[in-house]
């Protein structure tokens, strides 16, 4: 039993978990209090008293004092409360015994420790109890010593058998076994070469790390510094400053005066406010430029006395990211404890969408934890706090860190810090606007290297040279840095062949767009790094084996940066598997498949940057230096295109085979990081999305938006009806397609009930998984709105309950006021649409006149001529059923050169027409016309608009009838919904008001291109 003293603020004495400092007597003498830099010794009171200056340097978490001390002693007129009482301290110690029941598992190997087997326990504080207490972590003897062997040098180890509580009860065999392990551990520790002693370092106010002992050096790792999901390493070019300057050599830090007001968080906040208030991006850049040149005083004579790198870094929290493991609800939860306020009130205010504003409001209202009177925090202290917070994972530790910084903040200070944690300062400005204020080439240099500190140092170095020699100004070089991700070059949507030919007058490489995951591969000797499209490390199970094949594929490559795509490929067919199969569980389901790297570009090779080389040279270089390894490392399929007809053929092929699309690249184009100078062709882009997959879904619920859409419903839960279970299923969440005016109108028009994701308020009619519990729910789905949802394709998502069917990249393209829940897409129809979308598309893209200066002739099959416009003799034959269209051409000027498909599951919209013959790029499929072919020349009219037909599945030729009826804008109803039908084929006993028709009537309407009287 040890006597402990706990020091607290008087205003917080009621909350014993607040700031505390514990001192322990040694041989009835107190330790020197002066060793704590934030505390000082004063007049004695009961043997020991402390006077607080700022805050305690040691904060013990709740649960470490056991039991809680109860006696309080006050020192009148001071800022200190003294709490005394006996408490048992949890120390790191070990025990040993025999497993009693065989239920405990080894903490290291995770296997059960068999009953009667000797085990070693490590006594640790119990993190699961508010009242404190100890718990034991059990290990096998061998596992315990393996763990200690790999532990840090400062970790307490077992050095003698007597340190194990209960060792006296052991058998001799176990004693000998443990003694042998202790001896082995000691010998290995003695044999390990000792590193140079690392001296305790201190962080100065300028952010530099210095050694307190003269002559002692601060030991830094030579490995690349990992930050924000990527590694930063020294570039090989001697012109550049080191990527990670050694402490004390940073030009930015050396120019900084930590006591100047330019370093205050208050001035940083003012800068952010000025940038946010100005809508002009040029003005935003100028404001930041003036601050970095003139400082907070605004005079050139004074200049900027702050840390340029740190200021720019904090201005870009969404670009230079750290992970803090805190979401909005967790932040509210922690601050509700700190402010001692109602968490439900804070959660309600959070619905407005800005957690930083919520924290500011409740901080100002807090009586037990009021804000500081004046803002004295510096950005160096804020940066140190953020670095510390990023290392914390336990909730109590995070709360203590937030409480420490909040005690020194004004309300607006804390608001700014929360926004830094959330990676959004709400200035409506990106990296380009901030970095352009630093140097005209800073943004391009940053995109290429992603090393902000290196870019800032080079800018300051250039400015320093200009001061010495005004005529020697050099432009900032843009170059890649090995082992640091390069911002990938991107592609813009291409909606027509004509646009592609115009954008690439030199010719283009047409490349298969694989539906996998973009990966940037960095190799430096035997070290490999893999980065995703968002510059984050790729999961190891997707890329770990490539280190065995890349050296074989590039036998002469010591260092390189490759741009590539990773996907799973079937070893039997050689075809890629669908998107999403790279997941660790889904990949296991494909036993006969390999993860393959499709390489399409090389931007760095053996210390030479290739970004400035034209694509034709980079591609040739890649072929000269790479050897394909089948189904492991392969070239992406690429074809040089100079004629529109060749491009049309490739578009036909990729969509017919179910591939994602094409990427078109100018043969003379350089690699431009972050720029959308490539083109991508996908079926949902063609002809303004006419080829995209579409479904009419019901709005079932809604979610609060974020940022500018905070406090309003801006994300909507879409679903469909399942007639079998008579429940509603979720299909997708849709956030796109509505402009601001429409969103504002929907807030009033949509009838919603707020449930705040409460599971108890989820209605019984809704089949939904927990992750999609909405903030709002419709009271009656049969009265809810129906929207046309368009996406890139139908996809599989087990999280959704519509038989796992979802929509990829959904957007609302139309509010269907003309439809209700009965006429919306139901689950059986959705399944059919999904299956149809996976079938080969029933269309073709045909290029225009061969003599055209910008296009080439079609290389497709053009047999015969289009049939006459006269009526046909009968229903279509099976041979012609797949050719639903004859020569079709775009009509509107906006879609000249586009692609007009008539997929069998996506009928044309009312009012749509096809183009006149004069269009330079024609669309359609020319096939030999037959007498039996229905009249489909030039257009699929909306013949059956408004007709709701019940078509019994037993009807002869049911599938073809259904297909053509839907293609000409008819609506089919299910048997349970026959009451809503306007026409019935067969027996109309269940709906005597409907008109009775026959299959001949359907064909006759198609031939005459209008509704005729039922026959």
Swiss-Prot record:
GO cellular-component term (any): condensed nuclear chromosome
Catalytic activity from the UniProt record: ATP + (deoxyribonucleotide)n-3'-hydroxyl + 5'-phospho-(deoxyribonucleotide)m = (deoxyribonucleotide)n+m + AMP + diphosphate
UniProt entry keywords in alphabetical sequence: ATP-binding, Cell cycle, Cell division, DNA damage, DNA recombination, DNA repair, DNA replication, Ligase, Magnesium, Metal-binding, Nucleotide-binding, Nucleus, Phosphoprotein, Zinc, Zinc-finger
Pfam families reported for this sequence: DNA_ligase_A_C, DNA_ligase_A_M, DNA_ligase_A_N, LIG3_BRCT, zf-PARP
Disulfide bond annotation, renumbered to this chain: none
EC number: 6.5.1.1
Ranges annotated as spanning the membrane: none
Amino-acid positions noted as binding Mg(2+) 2 in the UniProt annotation, renumbered to this chain: 660
Tissue specificity comment: The alpha isoform is expressed in all tissues, while the beta isoform is expressed only in the testis.
Superkingdom: Eukaryota
Domain notes: The PARP-type zinc finger is required for DNA ligase activity.
Name of the protein: DNA ligase 3
Organism: Mus musculus
């Amino acid at each position: 039993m040890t006597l402990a003293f706990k020091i607290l603020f008087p205003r917080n004495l009621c909350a014993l978990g607040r700031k505390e400092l514990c001192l322990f007597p040694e041989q009835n003498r107190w330790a020197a209090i002066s060793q704590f830099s934030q505390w000082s010794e004063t007049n004695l009171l009961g043997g020991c008293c402390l006077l607080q200056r700022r805050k305690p340097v040691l904060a013990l978490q709740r649960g470490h004092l056991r039991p809680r001390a109860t006696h309080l002693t006050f020192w009148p007129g001071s800022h200190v409360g003294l709490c005394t009482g006996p408490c048992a301290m949890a120390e790191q110690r070990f025990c040993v015994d025999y497993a009693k029941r065989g239920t405990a598992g080894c903490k290291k190997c995770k296997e059960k420790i068999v009953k009667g087997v000797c085990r070693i326990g490590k006594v640790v504080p119990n993190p699961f109890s508010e009242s404190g207490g100890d718990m034991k972590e059990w290990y096998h003897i061998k596992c315990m010593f393996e763990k200690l062997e790999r532990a840090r040098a400062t970790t307490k180890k077992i050095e003698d058998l007597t340190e194990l509580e209960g060792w006296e009860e052991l058998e001799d065999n176990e004693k000998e076994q443990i003694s042998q392990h202790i001896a082995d551990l000691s010998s290995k520790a003695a044999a390990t070469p000792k590193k140079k002693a690392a001296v305790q370092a201190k962080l100065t106010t300028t952010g530099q790390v210095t050694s307190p002992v003269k002559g002692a050096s601060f030991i830094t790792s030579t490995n690349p510094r990992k930050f924000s999901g990527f590694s930063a390493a020294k570039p090989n070019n001697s012109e550049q400053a080191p990527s990670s300057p050694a402490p004390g050599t940073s030009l930015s830090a050396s120019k900084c005066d930590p006591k100047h007001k330019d370093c205050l968080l208050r001035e940083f906040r003012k800068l952010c406010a000025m940038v946010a208030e100005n809508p002009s991006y040029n003005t935003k850049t100028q404001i930041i430029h003036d601050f970095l040149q003139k400082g907070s005083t605004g005079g050139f004579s004074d200049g900027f006395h702050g840390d340029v790198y740190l200021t720019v870094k904090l201005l870009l929290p969404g670009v230079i990211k750290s992970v803090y493991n805190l979401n909005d609800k967790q932040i509210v939860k922690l601050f509700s404890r700190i402010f001692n306020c109602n968490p439900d009130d804070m959660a309600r205010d959070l619905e407005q969408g800005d957690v930083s504003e919520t924290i500011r409001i409740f901080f100002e209202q807090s009586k037990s934890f009021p804000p500081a009177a004046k803002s004295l925090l510096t950005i160096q202290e804020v940066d140190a706090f953020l670095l510390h917070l990023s290392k914390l994972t336990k909730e109590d530790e995070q709360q203590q860190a937030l409480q420490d910084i909040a005690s020194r903040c004004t309300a607006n200070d804390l608001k700014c810090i929360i926004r830094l944690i959330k990676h959004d300062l709400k200035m409506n400005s990106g990296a380009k606007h901030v970095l352009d204020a630093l140097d005209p080439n800073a943004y391009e240099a940053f995109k290429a290297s992603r090393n902000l500190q290196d870019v800032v140092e080079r800018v300051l170095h250039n400015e320093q040279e200009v001061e010495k020699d005004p005529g020697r100004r050099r432009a900032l070089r843009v170059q890649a840095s090995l082992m640091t991700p390069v911002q990938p070059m991107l592609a813009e949507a291409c909606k027509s062949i004509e646009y592609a030919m115009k954008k690439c007058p030199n010719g283009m490489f047409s490349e298969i767009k694989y539906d996998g995951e973009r990966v940037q591969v960095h190799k430096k000797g035997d070290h490999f790094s893999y980065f995703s499209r968002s510059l984050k490390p790729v999961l190891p199970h997707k890329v770990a084996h490539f280190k065995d094949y890349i050296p074989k594929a590039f036998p002469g490559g010591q260092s390189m940066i490759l741009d590539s795509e990773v996907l799973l490929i079937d070893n039997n067919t050689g075809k890629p598997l669908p998107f999403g199969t790279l997941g660790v569980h889904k990949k296991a389901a494909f036993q006969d498949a390999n993860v393959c790297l499709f390489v399409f570009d090389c931007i760095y090779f053996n210390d030479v940057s290739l970004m400035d080389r034209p694509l034709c040279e980079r591609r040739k270089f890649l072929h000269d230096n790479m050897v394909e390894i089948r189904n492991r490392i392969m070239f992406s399929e690429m074809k040089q295109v100079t004629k529109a007809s060749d491009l049309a053929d490739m578009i036909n092929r990729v969509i017919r085979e179910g591939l994602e699309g094409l990427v078109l690249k100018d043969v003379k184009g350089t690699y431009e990081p972050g720029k959308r100078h490539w083109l991508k062709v996908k079926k949902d882009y063609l002809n303004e999305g006419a080829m995209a997959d579409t479904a009419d879904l019901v709005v079932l619920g809604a979610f609060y938006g974020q940022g500018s859409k905070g406090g309003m419903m801006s994300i909507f839960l879409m679903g469909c009806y399942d007639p079998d279970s008579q429940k509603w299923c979720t299909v997708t969440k849709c956030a796109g397609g509505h402009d601001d005016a429409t969103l504002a109108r929907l807030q009033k028009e949509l009838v919603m009930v707020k449930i705040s994701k409460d599971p108890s308020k989820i209605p019984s009619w809704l089949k939904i998984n927990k992750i999609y519990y909405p903030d709002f729910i419709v009271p009656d789905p049969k009265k809810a709105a129906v929207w046309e949802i368009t996406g890139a394709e139908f996809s599989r998502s087990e999280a959704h309950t519509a038989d796992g069917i979802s929509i990829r990249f959904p957007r609302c393209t139309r509010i269907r006021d003309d439809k209700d829940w009965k006429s919306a897409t139901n689950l059986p129809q959705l399944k059919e649409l999904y299956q149809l979308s996976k079938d080969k598309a029933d269309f073709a893209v045909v290029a225009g006149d061969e003599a055209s200066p910008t296009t080439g002739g079609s290389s497709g099959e053009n047999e015969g001529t289009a049939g006459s416009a006269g009526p046909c003799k009968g229903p279509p034959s099976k041979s012609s059923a797949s050719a639903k269209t004859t020569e079709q051409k775009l009509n509107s000027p906006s879609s000249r050169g586009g692609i007009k498909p008539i997929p069998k599951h996506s009928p044309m919209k009312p009012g749509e027409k096809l183009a006149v013959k004069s269009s330079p790029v024609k669309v359609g499929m020319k096939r030999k016309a037959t007498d039996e072919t229905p009249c489909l020349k030039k257009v699929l009219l909306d013949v059956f608009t408004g007709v709701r037909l019940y078509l019994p599945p037993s009807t002869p030729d049911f599938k073809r009838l259904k297909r053509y009826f839907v293609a000409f804008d008819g609506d089919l109803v299910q048997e349970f919904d026959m009451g809503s039908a306007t026409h019935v084929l067969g027996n109309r006993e269940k709906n005597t008001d409907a008109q009775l028709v026959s299959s001949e009537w359907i064909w006759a309407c198609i031939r005459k291109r209008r509704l005729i009287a039922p026959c």
